[in-house]
A protein has these predicted regions:
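Short, well-ordered beta-strand elements
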Residues: 25-36, 56-60, 127-128
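Beta->alpha turn/N-cap motifs
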Residues: 36, 60-64, 74, 79-88, ...
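A conserved helix-loop-strand patch within extracytoplasmic ligand-binding domains
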Residues: 101-151
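Periplasmic-binding protein-like
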Residues: 103-112, 136-145, 200-264
């Protein structure tokens, strides 16, 4: 073997090894979630994904705004905490190039109270806390409309706000509050609508404690999201497969007993 041949083969071997290294995961994927059920579920996803060679670092956030900001900035590889109406609004408002890549779970929103046992008991002028973002606030207003307590403009859609209320016989006052803070308002307000991912850590279970609950067939199934430039990368398909596995489905059904339901 002459020197030239040896050099060529050495270079070729180095290229093969480099390619193999490129296929291997150099560092864990950073996945942003909100604290509570999303974090609990992703710890199970992490175990399933690791068997497929995918390393994951779960990073918890305490609000709905930062996970998309961090993903857009490149500080996360994906996030798992929001439904499509919320993501669509964020993309519209902030110009994010973030796309959904797979469905995860649904959190039927519940309405809770320490003062009344049903929506029918709400008196004239009652104050009700709702999330201050349009998509989740709209969810609550639709529940109140479905229960016959208010009427919304015909074209209000999924992102209705208190300004879209056109008939309100009991003059219910909807108080917009950051979603994460709503469990703390129950001592002061007549009722509050709390997203399940914030309700469960606060000791509230929609199946047991809610005085009213959104239908499980609502359009608010949560999703996995990534930057648009990453959506076709191999790790994305592996991540979705891990989340939508039978093992994760069984965990959700067993752990949350209907408070959180699989959406895949």
């Amino acid at each position: 073997m002459n020197k030239r041949t040896l050099i060529v083969r050495t270079v070729a071997l180095a290229a093969v090894l480099a390619a193999g290294g490129a296929l291997a995961q150099d560092k864990p994927l950073k996945i942003g979630v909100t604290a509570g059920p999303h974090a609990q579920i992703f710890e199970q996803v992490k175990k399933v994904a690791e068997r497929d060679g995918l390393k994951i670092q779960v990073i918890e956030f305490s609000d709905y705004v930062q996970p998309n900001a961090a993903l857009s900035a490149g500080d996360l590889d994906a996030n798992s905490y929001q439904h499509k109406p919320y993501l669509d609004q964020q993309v519209k408002d902030r110009g994010y190039r973030i796309v959904p890549v797979g469905y995860t779970v649904n959190f039927p929103i519940g309405i809770y109270s320490k003062k009344v046992k049903s929506l029918a008991e709400l008196k004239e002028g009652s104050r009700v806390g709702i999330p201050n973002d349009p998509t989740n606030g709209g969810r609550v207003l639709l529940v109140f409309q479905d229960k016959g307590l208010i009427k919304l403009r015909a074209d209000a859609g999924l992102k209705a706000t208190p300004l879209d209320v056109v008939d309100n016989p009991r003059k219910i006052r909807f108080v917009e509050v950051d979603a994460a803070q709503l469990p703390r308002t129950l001592d002061d307000l007549d009722a509050s609508a709390v997203n399940t991912n914030y309700a469960l850590p606060a000791g509230l279970n929609p199946g047991r404690d809610a005085i009213a609950q959104e239908s499980a067939k609502s359009p608010y199934v949560n999703l996995l999201a990534v930057r648009e430039q990453d959506k076709d990368k191999p790790w994305v398909a592996k991540l979705v497969k891990a989340y939508q596995s039978d093992e994760v489905r069984r965990f959700v059904q067993t752990e949350f007993k209907g408070a959180v339901v699989p959406g895949f």
